[in-house]
Amino acid sequence: IDIQAINFEFGSSVIPRRERWKVEEIADAFNRLIDRNPEELILIEGHTDAVGTRQANQRLSEARAAQLKRDLIRYFGVPGYNLDTVGYGEDFLLVPTQNENWRNRRVTIRRVTDVVSPY
């Protein structure tokens, strides 16, 4: 899937309208993967910038990942069984700064089937 990230407004877990096309492309790709292998596992990773407390950023990153998962299930029929979420807060900044930076406010996706598969 050739999408770097879905970016968010400051302090928000709502997926902006300008990012919705990415969600649709992600859903299409996930559904194709899952059609080929019903055991696919995809990890949705939430991130924040470094503004605010670590605890607030952790909660926000988890909410961002959960929002994408909900949208994929509700609007695009991606099976929830194949999706997992994690929030990293401000731990993995793309742009190392203590200031607000839109590139750090994101969710990323990772196919982890091969990592967790017992085969």
Language-model features: locations:
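Periplasmic peptidoglycan-binding/anchoring modules of Gram-negative envelope and division proteins
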Residues: 8, 12-45, 69-74, 109, ...
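Periplasmic OmpA-like peptidoglycan-binding domain that tethers envelope proteins to the cell wall
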Residues: 45-119
